[in-house]
Amino acid sequence: MSRGIVIIGSGFAARQLVKNIRKQDATVALTLIAADSMDEYNKPDLSHVISQAQRADDLTRQSAGEFAEQFNLRLFPHTWITDIDADAHVVKSQDKQWQFDKLVLATGASAFVPPVAGRELMLTLNSQQEYRACETQLRDAQRVLIVGGGLIGSELAMDFCRAGKAVTLIDNAASILASLMPPEVSSRLQHRLTDMGVHLLLKSQLQGLEKTATGIRATLDRDRQVEVDAVIAATGLRPETALARRAGLTINRGVCVDSYLQTSHPDIYALGDCAEINGQVLPFLQPIQLSAMYLAKNLLGGNAPLKLPAMLVKIKTPELPLHLAGETQRCDLNWHIAAESEGMVARGINTEGQLCAFVVSEDRMKEAFALLKTLPA
């Protein structure tokens, strides 16, 4: 008797997989299990909730019940999976268990909170649930410290500034977006943030947080202090691998999978932010969409290896939006930057004269797709 496909998780990756499976098979048994409410929301919207005065509930697009009815699923929200018996093909919660033919881990990633004194005072904005827990504090806060100047930190800094709040952003790198691009490319956005009033503390390190009568005191290196009303950790994500580890699967940074999204167990797969595909963790929407499409075929008996083309990453900073693609983080590229009032085009060229990466901003973003076609796959 068929036990069907069980998916652990209910985020973007899980939903994309369900939709792709149902395009090909309307009847295969599908079960989704997740610790949250399983309501659908658009996670990138979290970068703009403050300036748009949105509450957590405003983000909901579709209830779990509507999703289950539309796609003929069994849903188990607010359910923590405690163990996976890979050999027996069983997943277990505290009081239930489910058998599976194929299991998909779509457990996502959790926000990394720096291990400093007072770390419990830091907020994270990695889910609708996390925003719901702190939305009143963030709405009322006038002074905000953002720890981390990467993609999410830069988006949040601009959003809070647009909402009229006093924003300080701290990062130990010498420039924002340091893991994505060199400083000569990110400087245009960095200057815009500064012009808007964001106080950038680069080459700086947070050492501790302490509650005071009037807010939160952040202690930095070089005997500096700043007092704020809220502190947000935007220091990256860590793939959720605990369940996979307990199941005996191979783990590195994420749950290791091959080009078929298959883990070290032949009937267990991983998808989305938790997955490490052939050594790469790709926590962006487009690779997740493509991965879900290929995995659906493979779960239903196909044999389709994932092929990822060069893809755009969008940085949603409305006052100066950016699109980037290729190996922008490579340190051996020679960057050719054309910056004008209407926008910037930065091309990363290797020693053989080939385009390997690009970053475009503002009105020059319309050139992104033509540039994308010239990148190596």
From Swiss-Prot:
It comes from the Bacteria. One of its GO terms (molecular function) is oxidoreductase activity, acting on iron-sulfur proteins as donors, NAD or NADP as acceptor. Its EC number is 1.18.1.-. It holds the Pfam family Pyr_redox_2. It catalyses: 2 reduced [nitric oxide reductase rubredoxin domain] + NAD(+) + H(+) = 2 oxidized [nitric oxide reductase rubredoxin domain] + NADH. Pathway: Nitrogen metabolism; nitric oxide reduction. InterPro entries: FAD-bd_OxRdtase, FAD/NAD-bd_sf, FAD/NAD-binding_dom, NO_rdtase_NorW, Rbx-bd. GO terms for cellular component: cytoplasm. It is an enzyme of class 1 (oxidoreductase). It is found in: Cytoplasm. Its cofactor is FAD. Keywords: Cytoplasm, FAD, Flavoprotein, NAD, Oxidoreductase. Its main location: cytoplasm. One of at least two accessory proteins for anaerobic nitric oxide (NO) reductase. Reduces the rubredoxin moiety of NO reductase. PANTHER family: NITRITE REDUCTASE [NAD(P)H], PYRIDINE NUCLEOTIDE-DISULFIDE OXIDOREDUCTASE DOMAIN-CONTAINING. HAMAP family: NorW. Belongs to the FAD-dependent oxidoreductase family. NCBIfam families: PRK04965.1. This is Nitric oxide reductase FlRd-NAD(+) reductase. It comes from Citrobacter koseri (strain ATCC BAA-895 / CDC 4225-83 / SGSC4696). The lineage of its organism: Bacteria, Pseudomonadati, Pseudomonadota, Gammaproteobacteria, Enterobacterales.
